[in-house]
């Protein structure tokens, strides 16, 4: 609903924070597709935990939090192609990334047209 109603907004940048909470599977793919379409009209930033949504993105970053001496630290990392495959695989399969989850991640990225050889504009290395 948030994605659909934002189409009428005239702002150049849209930010979605976990717009995909409580969904999965086919619905997640639809949300990812709709976000990608919105990205053709304006800049879209989306926080997601779903690989189906992340795989639709043109660019992907990994955000992580750690706590040191009672202080919470946040880090953000732009993902190059190989790191993106590993992150999608982690999202698919959990902590232990296997050859099978890596292959599944590659297939998901290729199928969505967001990986080299499939029309991607992802950089080959991190900035």
Located regions from the model:
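C-terminal lobe/lid and adjacent interdomain/linker elements of RecA-like ASCE P-loop ATPase modules
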Residues: 26-127
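Walker B catalytic acidic pair
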Residues: 17-18
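GG-anchored amphipathic helix commonly corresponding to the ABC/SMC/Rad50 NBD signature/C-loop
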Residues: 1-14, 38
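Short, glycine-/Ser/Thr-/acidic-enriched flexible segments
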Residues: 4, 21, 68
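Conserved D-loop-proximal element of ABC-family nucleotide-binding domains
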Residues: 8-9, 21-29
């Amino acid at each position: 609903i948030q994605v659909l109603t934002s189409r009428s907004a005239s702002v150049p940048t849209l930010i979605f924070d976990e717009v995909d909470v409580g969904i999965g599977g086919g619905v997640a793919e639809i949300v990812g597709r709709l976000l990608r379409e919105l990205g053709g009209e304006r800049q879209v930033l989306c926080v997601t935990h779903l690989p189906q949504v992340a795989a639709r993105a043109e660019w992907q970053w990994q955000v992580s939090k750690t706590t040191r001496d009672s202080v919470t630290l946040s880090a953000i990392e732009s993902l190059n192609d190989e790191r993106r495959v590993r992150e999608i695989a982690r999202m698919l399969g959990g902590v232990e990334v296997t050859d099978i989850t890596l292959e599944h991640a590659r297939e998901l990225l290729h199928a969505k047209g967001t990986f080299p050889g499939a029309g991607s504009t992802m950089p080959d290395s991190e900035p």
